[in-house]
Amino acid sequence: ITMIGEYLKEDGNPKTKEQIENLVRNGMNKELRDRLCCRLTFGTAGLRSAMGAGFCYINDLTVIQSTQGMYKYLERCFSDFRQRGFVVGYDTRGQVTSSCSSKRLAKLTAAVLLAKGVPVYLFSKYVPTPFVPYAVRHLKAAAGVMITASHNRKEDNGYKVYWENGAQITSPHDKEILKCIEECVEPWNGSWNENLVDTSPLTRDPLEEISKIYMEDLKKICYHRELNTKTNLKFIHTSFHGVGHDYVQLAFKAFGFKPPIPVPEQKDPDPDFSTVKCPNPEEGESVLELSLRLAEKESARVVVATDPDADRLAVAELQENGRWKVFTGNELAALFGWWMFRSWKANSSKEADVKNVYMLATTVSSKILKAIARKEGFHFEETLPGFKWIGSRVKDLLDNGKEVLFQHPAGRQAPPGVAPLWHRIYTPADPSAPQFLLTARVGRWNVECGLADLHIPSVSPVLPSS
């Protein structure tokens, strides 16, 4: 009874409040206990749960409470928090029954901070998740939040936190933030006032600036723009009803390629993900059915898929036998690692020191980058699984003047990097299928380094020179 009263008192959203009132009216005590007797756990990835009413669901109230805890902790950590500000981005998720959408949750997140005099960089439009950590670093903000559940089912949403270094938070930040949340669960004055987003002089829209500079940064890893403009290679892209379409189009343009052909049924945002059972591109051919069908119609040999918040990638390629090859993450890492090192070597001065070059992977990833590093002479490091660990290490290396060419899982360079990589692969006189180019090269390194985690084919095609 106490928890019911507390929730109804604190929740300012009529729809979620009504959900709890209906459960009380219908005597659904077990459901009430499940929803109200435990709170969301705040971890190093922030929050993630189903949308709906209750303390253990993602909703207006729990996001306000979490942001109040974030404010309290950041105020303790940064004496200049009110000067540096906070970044907020969001995807296109939403749930009608609880009046809960990523955009609304982002506005409430901003309102909590604006009411406390903190400048908020709130994107005026949905953005890919990588834009938020990029903006945190570029704008020198204290931290940032992305409202997204990435490739999860449509019922879910999340609250992903990034620290000042652009990486997801690590312990003990998560535990300290959770303590702060528990100390201030009652909404403050102004926390429900989402109109502050439109009226406060502390609200800033970073969309145009970040989009422009992000794409300019992408151009720095584009080594053959003139050749790219002349290619006839076609690409199909699906964004799985998420944020990716506009931004992948911009990324291809930055590299000089013709825009990829979008899958029309999946191009526009749709919080119901109505054409796929699971909006995760790593599920393989089962979720790429519309993409592969369009590719065959358009005579395109390469399909690129991004998940709903555009931070996860899948690539499929038509083989000589007429079948589609969907590359694994480890196979893509081998290709991207080879491509980035080859491009670095071809475009560096003679004085460039390979010992200043790094590639990183997590401990659960393939050892292929380690094999390439051993052969080519650059540094390879492993981190614990998770973008938070690899991101923090990349930041440390960059701050110490090192050059990080690639990290697996791949970061922002992956989606636009597909096009020049495949264009280069098809450039040789013998246009062997990328599967063979990949596995033959990987196979050579596996034999040399005692690795056996990728298949070695029985063919020996001509390889692009390293």
Tell me the role of every PLM-derived stretch.
Residues S124-K125, C184-L207, L318-P409, A414-G417:
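Proline/glycine-rich low-complexity loops and linkers
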